[in-house]
Each structure stands twice: as C-alpha cells, then as structure tokens.
Amino acid sequence: MNLSEELLEAFKGFSGAHGQTDVSQERTAGKQKAKSFIVRNPLTLQLMEGHISGKKGIGAIPINEENKCRFGALDIDEYPLDHNQLIDKLEELKVPCIVCRSKSGGAHIFFFFKEWMSAGDFRDKAAEISSALGHGRCEIFP
C-alpha cells in the first residue's frame, strides 16, 4: 500500500462527501486567506494524491452514515504551546495518538481506531483527555 492508500484507509469517514480548502495568495494579518467547503463527492485516491503533493487541501468527514467514526482529533489553539510538554503529558497518560504542529503553532492530536465507534463516545473520551491535558476548551472533531 502506498502513502495515499494508507491515508485514505486511516481517514475513513463519510463516503458521500469530503472537505476542501482553497487557499488564496491574499493575506490578512500575515495569514493567507482560505475558504473551506464541502464537496458532495467521495474522497478518492486521486484527491489524496493531490493533497499529498500540495495541489489541493482536502479533508475527510469523520462521521459515517451510521454516526460512527474511525478517527478523531483535538485541535489545540493556545499560544505559546510547548509541544514537547504536551507529548510528555500524553505519554504519561498512556494516550495512543499522533501529535502534529498546526500551521498556526498549535497542535492537532489525532486518534485512530481499528473498529468504528460511536462519535458521541469518542467525543466524551476526547473531552476527558483534553481536560486531563489542561486544554478542556479545545475543539474536538468529530
């Protein structure tokens, strides 16, 4: 399996649509302007390959048609953020996840599951984790 196929498998969600972000060259307060929207077509291998190559920003919709998910995320937008301290705390709590620095300097914490789980159950658990990390007000996806 190549990287695009692995990512498409890891980010399985709603099969009828995906997110897309178009970034303009226009800047406001130092940040590039972007417009995100839903495209009512499935997320495909070709789209994932374009995303990896930097051609088009896309995103999977985590919740499937049965209100279940196989991945979720925390979006921490608190600054300054000590990423090493965050990772140490997650390891201390024995939370299996992947931490990525966001473009703005915050963090995206991704969780992946072998089986589909209730989106509500994930949100409840993610809220517990975010509170334990001291970031109880962060965004939870889904």
Tell where the protein language model's regions lie, with residue ranges:
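Histidine-centered divalent-metal-coordination microenvironment in nucleic-acid enzymes
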Residues: 73-74, 96-122
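Active-site-adjacent loop/helix surface patches within enzyme catalytic domains
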Residues: 71-77, 81-102
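Short secondary-structure junctions
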Residues: 17-21, 95-99, 136-138
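Catalytic "initiation/cleavage/transfer" segments centered on a nucleophilic residue
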Residues: 7, 134-142
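A signal for specific C-terminal beta-sheet/loop modules enriched in small/flexible residues
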Residues: 30, 40-44, 54, 101, ...
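Short beta-strand
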Residues: 61-64, 97-104, 139-142
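Helical (often loop-to-helix) elements that flank the catalytic cores of nucleotide-handling enzymes
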Residues: 82-92, 112-137
